[in-house]
Amino acid sequence: MLKRIISGICLVIITAPALYFGGWFLYALCLFISLVGNYELLRVAGLEKSPLGICAYVSTVVYYILLDSADNRYSMLVIVAAFLAMMTIYVFTFPKYKAENIMWSFFGIIYVTMMLAYIYETRRLDNGVYLVWLIFVSSWGNDTFAYFTGVLIGKHKMAPILSPKKSIEGAIGGIVGATALGVI
């Protein structure tokens, strides 16, 4: 529990100024976290130094460059180009890589890169400084309320094999808590 609290405090110290000031500070932080997140995800699959991994890293950087351009509608083309490049690697190196390797690499771009980019995009909106905090407060509130509700009254396991400590009561408590924080 102490490790979680210390990690949370460090995260707030780094994240709060980036979210408040936005701009290049938040942009650089999101790009950095996207690259590290992709690396960590690809490392699990043993692909972090492979051509598929390099394709994911390059796609992440290009996606962010286009995201901040005057006309960012082309950023989705990066996703399509990344998929085509990964499939090309798959075909020309067959049977070195499996289809699941493509999935790991492409999933990192979608799940890590694009999702973090939405934080930057949200911050750029009118009143974005408040909206982006709402995302974090709701997420942290959900985790906190789910944890304490589950510890206090959780009896019905939600997914015993996948996550043995999570309960249905905790999930409901998290949703109610996040909703309450969002309303406040």
Label the predicted regions.
Residues 1-184:
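Membrane-embedded alpha-helical bundles of polytopic integral membrane proteins
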